[in-house]
Amino acid sequence: MDGVCKSPQRLLFVLVSCFGLVQSYKNGLVSSVCGSMMPNHGANAQISSPPFTVTADKTTFKEGDQITVTLNSQTGYQFEGFMLQARQVGSSSSIGTFSVTASNMQLLTCDGVSARSVSHTSNSKKSSIQAKWTAPTSGQLGNIQFSVTFVKSDDTFWVGVKSSAVVYNGAGTTGTSTTPATVAPTVASIPGCGTTKVCFSQPNNCDPTTSTGCYFVAVQASSDQSEMRIEMFGPADGYVAIGFSDDQQMGNDDVYICGKDNNGNLQVQHAFNSGRSRPAILSLGNVTDILTAVTNGNINCSFISRNTISTASRAATTNEYYLMIAAGSSSQGNIQFHTNKYVTSTKVNLLNPSVVITSEEEFPPMVKAHGCLMLISWMATGSIGMIIARYLKGVAKGQGCFGKDFWFVAHVSLMTLSIIATAIAFIIVFVSAGDWAGGAHPVLGCLVMILSLIQPIVAAFRCEPQHERRFVFNWAHSCNAFAIKCLAVAAIFTGLALFEEYDSDGWMLKVMGGYLAWEALMYILQDLNLRAKKKDSQLCSCEPMRPETILLFLFIIGNLAFLIALLVGIGSA
């Protein structure tokens, strides 16, 4: 110190240098930190969610395009200084040039190129800033992001606040409101699962980079849960979504959707799911670093969210949630009912990195009960009741109970059981799901239920067997029964397909195909026997074992064999 004091020239030099250093930041002349964008204020950058955002007015660009970039602050906040650059995604080098018109902004030279960056001219308070960026007219261009350093005060600043990615397409296509789809490698990945992030996938432990039919989500949360990196991946033609829920049912959930807009580009949306209708789309909020891709039919997204997770329409105070994956189709940018849904079996602590393994009880017991009741209704009681009414009216004719023939009592009893079981199955699956699942299966199931209820109502008002109009009822009753049977078989096929989404062998569908062939064979044999009887009028009606009775016995044994196989399959699904 004495040396400095004894040398007035040296003291003057130090004072001028310090003064120049301070002034250089107040007037925004910060070209020396173009690479790091880090203010030399002697303080560390903030890691909390910034109260400032940077947005672009376009989502795609080509050579020579101009993009308006806006820096905004949240209500109640202002910034004194800033530094703005455009950078290719994953690069630390600036690209393109800026132009400004306002007096509170200036252009800086970075990487030896003028107008590569924009900064402030004074430390006056600012709420919003706009600048125009012009893309290069040549060179190796790629997707870009606008990166900003916001200075709230000398010791409070945020570095590297990024906009959503702007896609280079070289064809001049621009967008106005959606996050574009980038053509990139898989952005959701296994590395870090269990060590730095929570991962949930179906099938368990599938790898989105190598597995087929893999649905995958990952969440990497900061220690105070103010920031989360979210990854989503799944085979879908419309969207993949992740939900944060307080329970295992859809409703009152915080949701992020990675789906196609009306131009076929991927967009990330923030939504709140009420469980009874299409999720309500919210403002995207503080979401940055968006990367999206479609690879081999798989939708693929990652982004950083600084939004608070909100369930039951209020901000949650916990870090434990059930994670949900949903996927399905979209139409004109609107998501449709999901065709695939998976939920963790327990709540997941987002601050505790783990690999979530769901129990083998993939399908809720009520869904399995629904499937079993439907199979029993239309592979056993319903099928047997129908074949008795068609081919066994002559067996034990004149004998019966309650004044009715045995065939009639058996037919009515079996069909009544079928309708009751169908109604129970219909109710419990809606109670379990809580909403409309979408797809062909529920439509077919509703048609089966409606026509099944019509059948006994019409039968209750039928005319006497000798009435001249009786044939009208007979034909209507038979045609409706045939329609119910066809729809029920189709519903079973589509239902089994839902159980077998990850069974590459698909054995239950093959068993159902075998059952269909078996039943067709039995009907053909019964019909041939009926025709033979009509030709041979001398056939004794009192034979101890008539051919139709033997065929009925075989029919029941075969149906039960197929039924038991499918019941076992559903039970172990």
UniProtKB/Swiss-Prot annotation:
Disulfide bonds: none annotated. PANTHER family: CYTOCHROME B561/FERRIC REDUCTASE TRANSMEMBRANE, FERRIC-CHELATE REDUCTASE 1-RELATED. SMART domains: B561 (SM00665), DoH (SM00664). The keyword Membrane applies. CDD domains: Cyt_b561_FRRS1_like, DOMON_SDR_2_like, Reeler. The lineage of its organism: Eukaryota, Metazoa, Chordata, Craniata, Vertebrata. Its cofactor is heme b. It comes from Danio rerio (Zebrafish). Keywords: Electron transport, Glycoprotein, Iron, Membrane, Metal-binding, Oxidoreductase, Transmembrane, Transmembrane helix, Transport. Putative ferric-chelate reductases reduce Fe(3+) to Fe(2+) before its transport from the endosome to the cytoplasm. Heme b 1 binds at H370, H441. InterPro entries: Cyt_b561/ferric_Rdtase_TM, DOMON_domain, Ferric-chelate_Red/DefProt, Reeler_dom, Reeler_sf. This is Putative ferric-chelate reductase 1. One of its GO terms (cellular component) is membrane. Heme b 2 binds at H411, H477. Pfam families: DOMON, Reeler. It is a multi-pass membrane protein. Residues 15-181 form the Reelin domain. One of its GO terms (molecular function) is metal ion binding. Binds 2 heme b groups non-covalently. The chain crosses the membrane at residues 4-24, 369-389, 414-434, 441-461, 479-499, 506-526, 550-570. It is found in: Membrane. The keyword Transmembrane applies. Glycans are attached at N286, N300. Residues 332-532 form the Cytochrome b561 domain. Residues 213-328 form the DOMON domain. Its EC number is 1.-.-.-.
